[in-house]
Amino acid sequence: SGNLLCVKVVPRIPILHAVPNQGESFYMDANGNSMPTDQFLLDLSLVTGYVTTEFAKENLLELAQFMNTQAPWNREIQQIHVTSNQRIELVPMKGEHIIVLGSSADVEDKMKRLGAFYDATSENMAWQRYATLDLSYEGQIVCKKKKNK
């Protein structure tokens, strides 16, 4: 008698789902803690490619938090992809283009530029002419046209 057990439970809420080219897929919470994905499936920012837990923790947490909370990006971006040289690309729901972020630095500014570009080209859907929209250059968007088939 008199024995008391106190348990403090702190829920970890994942903010991104990583499916790397090599290794096990994982969820990561806002504190950079990874957790296994075999227990449940959540609708989160999907990260693919050359992503490790360390890279995700150092480079993708802020980006995933931004994408999950900022309209319209939380519904317009379906995938975050990490290339073999660790450049970050976004795959939008609409269109057949790739959005090149480069790094996750200045993500808010980069996405403002992208939003302004989409707004300016939405009437004639001119953004569909491009294979890539590169936001990695400060203050500009460099567009690469699609190759003719």
Outline where the language-model segments fall:
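Charged, solvent-exposed interaction patches on well-folded alpha/beta domains
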Residues: 1-149
